[in-house]
Amino acid sequence: ALEVCKDEILGHKYAKTHDCLGRLLKIYDFGTRIFYHLHQKDEDAIKVGMNSKEEAYHFLDKPLGPHPETFFGVHASIVRENKQNEIFLPYLEKWEGEEILKYSKAYMNIPGEGFHLPAGLLHAPGTALTLELQESSDVMAVLQAEIEGLKIGKDLLHHHITGEAWEKDSEAAVLDLIDWEANADPYFYENHHLS
């Protein structure tokens, strides 16, 4: 459709500089929470030939599912006390369990509300029926080794990290992708909540 009606679909001005909208709209309804992960910022995504990925969630009326809460960010004290590597690196090296979530904050998935999530923010979406608008990229780094007994392959931790970075810093390379200040924002809810 874009090849035939590019100006009509994208608008003349936008079509001059863009080949596509670069956005996807998804509706998801998972039986379990999605793993704790992040989408790399522009400067990191481009290193692996990809685009960064921003997301926005809107929670629909029903069903909420068994875990209608989403984990976002990290506790502010972790960054304030500069304990990111001390706390997170052992989880990434050991790669088991889901206890890494205890260092994040869970927010209820309230129908009619949602969240905006720039690239670089850690998150583990809940099970509420969700309308998600996202940039069209699959770039990510997964930091959670297991969800409710289901093992997650460690390759998802470093799949979108350069081979050089992984060889040099291994699991610590993932921690360099995280926007720690944004993840520890004491006003995270106020700055990202959509109503």
Sequence positions of predicted segments:
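Pseudouridine synthase
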Residues: 120
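Active-site region of the double-stranded beta-helix
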Residues: 1-111, 124-195
